[in-house]
Amino acid sequence: MGAIGFDNQKYLTTQSEQIKKRIHQFGGKLYLEFGGKLFDDYHASRVLPGFEPDSKIRMLQQLKDDVEIVIAINAGDIEKNKMRGDLGITYDEDVLRLIDIFRDMGLYVGSVVLTRYNGQDAADAFLHRLKKLGIRCYRHYPIAGYPSDVAHIVSDEGLGKNDYIETSHSLIVVTAPGPGSGKMATCLSQLYHDHKRGIDAGYAKFETFPIWNLPLKHPVNLAYEAATADLDDVNMIDPFHLEAYGITTVNYNRDVEIFPVLNAIFEKIQGKSPYKSPTDMGVNMAGNCIVDDEVCRAASRMEILRRYYTAKTELVQGKGAEETVRKLELVMQQAGVTPEICPAVAAALDKAEATGAPAGAMVLPDGRVITGKTSGTLGAAAALLLNALKALGNIDDQFELISKQVLEPVCHLKTTYLDHRNPRLHTDEVLMTLAISALTNPLADLAKRQLPGLRDSEAHFSVIISEEDLKIFKRLGVRVSCEPKYETKRLYHR
C-alpha cells in the first residue's frame, strides 16, 4: 500500500450527508443526475490515493432506504447498437447488467426510460424485452429546439409530451450506460411533471471531477482534463459563482455553457431558479476529503504521464488523434510533468538499449525498480512479472521459478501446433506455468503468493505490449505505459 492522500471513510460520511441536506432543501424529493462511473472508478482511485473504486456505490448503499434508480438510455443508441468500449457490450445489454448489479447491492431499480424515442424498431424490441422481464419502462421524445427554446421546452408540446416516470422514493438517482443518454433531460422532464402535480422536487448533479474547490490548475483537475482530452471538455473558472459570491470555483465548460439555459428552464418550471451557478448544482464533497495534497498531486502527475503515453500509443495504432496528443502535451506542461517523474521509464529504456531487445521496468509499491528483458522463452512483460514476484518474495535472482524443462515445451507447442510466430510466453501463459510449477517448487509457490503485492506498481515498456499482457497487468492492479512503437515493422499486430 502506497501513501494515502484521501480519507475514504470521511468521504462516505460527508457525501451522503450532503445529499441528505439537498433532499431536505427541496422538500423531500431530489433528482440526482449521476455523471461518471458509479462502479469501478479507477481514475478517481489513481489520482486520489485512498479513494476506493466502489466508493460512490457504497455511499448510495448508506442511503439505500431513500434511493430509487432510474436508468436512461438513448433510443438512437439502441438502434445503432452502440457499444461500451471498455466492456465490449451494447448499451442495451449494459442496462440489464446495471440492473443486476444495483439489485445485488440492495438498491431499488424503479424503471428504465428510453430517451429521444421516435418509434425505432430496435427500441420497441427492447421495450418489449424489458416489459417481459417485469421492468417498468417509459418513453421520452425528441423536443424541437432543445435545449435553447425554453418556451417550447417548458410546455405541453415539449416536456409535457414525455411519459411521467412514477417514483416512490425521495432520492431518484438518474444514471446511464454512457454519455449522451439524456440524464439531465430526464431530470428536467420529471421536475416539469412533478410541478404540474403539485409535488415539490429539486435537481442536483453528482460529478467527481473537476473538483470545484481545488485550484483550476491543480494536478488533480488537470488529470481530469487529461482523461477527457479526446473530448471537448475544458476546466474553467465558474464565472456565475464568482459573480454571485465572489468565490473562485472550478467547473467544466459544458456545465458553464448550458447554465443560463438551465436557469431559464428552472425559472419557467418553478417560478424561480434554486441555483446561482453551475457549482451550486453540484453536491461533490471529494475536495473536502483530501488529507495529503502532495500525495494527490504526485499521483495525478503520474496519471497525466500515463494518459500521454496511452494517447501516443493509440496514435500509432490508428485509434487516436494528433489533437489529443497536443492537448495532453499542453496539460503536461501546465502540470510540470516529464517522463523523468517515473523511474520505470528510464530503467526500461536503459535495459532495452543494453540488451538490444524489448524490455520493461516496474516501480514496486516500496519504491524498488525492477527490470525485465526479452529472452528465448519469455517476452519482456512475462520476464518483468516474474522478476517483480521474485523481488517481492525476496527470492535470489539465481533461482529458477519455472524450469526450462517446462518453458521450452510450451514454447514449442505454440509455434509447432498453434501457428504462433512468437514462441515467447505472455504474462497469462507464464502465470499458468508458474501455478503448475508451484505444486512441486516451493519458491514458485512463494512467488505466486506475492501477486497481490503488485497492486499499485508502475510499469513501463520500451515497446507496445500485447493486449493479453495489458489485461493481465490491469487485473493485477499494475499501471502500465509503453513507448509508442512496435517491436517489429510488421503492419498487422495482435
Where in the sequence are the language-model features?
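Flexible phosphate-sensing "switch/lid" loops adjacent to ATP/NTP-binding sites
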Residues: 1-175, 190-351, 357, 364-366, ...
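The conserved Walker
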Residues: 178-179
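Hydrophobic positions on the alpha1 helix immediately C-terminal to the Walker A/P-loop
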Residues: 186
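Short clusters of small/polar residues that mark proteolytic maturation junctions
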Residues: 373-374
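A short, polar/charged loop-to-alpha-helix boundary motif
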Residues: 377-393
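Short HxH-centered metal-ligating active-site micro-motif
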Residues: 391-423
